[in-house]
Amino acid sequence: MSGNNVQEEDSTFHVSNLYSETEIKKITQDFISEKIREQNFEEIVKYSNIRIFLSLVLIVIGTYCSIFVQYKKNPVIMIQLLVAFFVVSTTLIIFEYFFFDDVFMILRSNNGSLVKLYCRLDVKKSTLILAYKLNKNVFETSFELKRLYNENGYLMKPYAKNVVMNFLSAHGRTLKLKN
């Protein structure tokens, strides 16, 4: 076994099912996020924090309702909590659907607008496309799947890093760096 294979097997970027679009996108997005953070671009996390907060509110309402409220003794409180749970759930779903969709990372551009990075799989071309929209224009960079993952499902870091760095050199000037 060569030293390169040992390095690959120690990797946390491993896909257990090469036919799983979700898993391929998730592992690749984790790698891309890590590389972009290393380059010190300004990431916007407040929207993720809103998602986390709404999820925690749902957990608290559900837990309180199931542990402390008995329907036979307090039916009005139970109904109020269920309505609150439904309202918060609907808010979270709407927020996810309209704002996040497939977005895995939000960065700030130099002009102050948001840059939402997302990945999509093009099965016909056998590529994973890293893209973002800015001023109604879509900018894309493609990863060849056969070069992105080896036959054992390990991310080929040198190739992936090279594509991410090419993406950042081509589009990084529009992204804002941290102060």
From Swiss-Prot:
Keywords, alphabetical: Endoplasmic reticulum, Membrane, Transmembrane, Transmembrane helix
Residues in the Extracellular compartment per record: 70-74
Subcellular location: Endoplasmic reticulum membrane
Segments in the Cytoplasmic topological domain: 1-48, 96-179
Traits of the deletion mutant: Causes a severe growth defect in host erythrocytes. Export of protein containing a PEXEL motif, including PIESP2, PTP3 and PTP2 is severely reduced at the ring and trophozoite stages. Similarly, export of RESA is reduced at the schizont stage.
Superkingdom of origin: Eukaryota
GO cellular component, as recorded: endoplasmic reticulum; signal peptidase complex
Biological processes annotated in GO: protein transport; signal peptide processing
GO molecular function, one term: endopeptidase activity
Quaternary data: Component of the signal peptidase complex (SPC) composed of a catalytic subunit SEC11/SPC21 and three accessory subunits SPC25, SPC3/SPC22, SPC1/SPC12. The complex induces a local thinning of the ER membrane which is used to measure the length of the signal peptide (SP) h-region of protein substrates. This ensures the selectivity of the complex towards h-regions shorter than 18-20 amino acids. Within the complex, interacts with SEC11/SPC21. Component of a complex composed of SPC25 and PMV; the interaction is mediated via the transmembrane domains.
Family: Belongs to the SPCS2 family.
Function: Component of the signal peptidase complex (SPC) which catalyzes the cleavage of N-terminal signal sequences from nascent proteins as they are translocated into the lumen of the endoplasmic reticulum. Enhances the enzymatic activity of SPC and facilitates the interactions between different components of the translocation site. Also, regulatory component of the CSP25-plasmepsin PMV complex which cleaves the pentameric localization motif RxLxE/Q/D (termed Plasmodium export element (PEXEL)) located downstream of the N-terminal secretory signal sequence of several proteins.
Record-given protein name: Signal peptidase complex subunit 2
Species per Swiss-Prot/TrEMBL record: Plasmodium falciparum (isolate 3D7)
Name of the gene encoding the protein in the UniProt record: SPC25
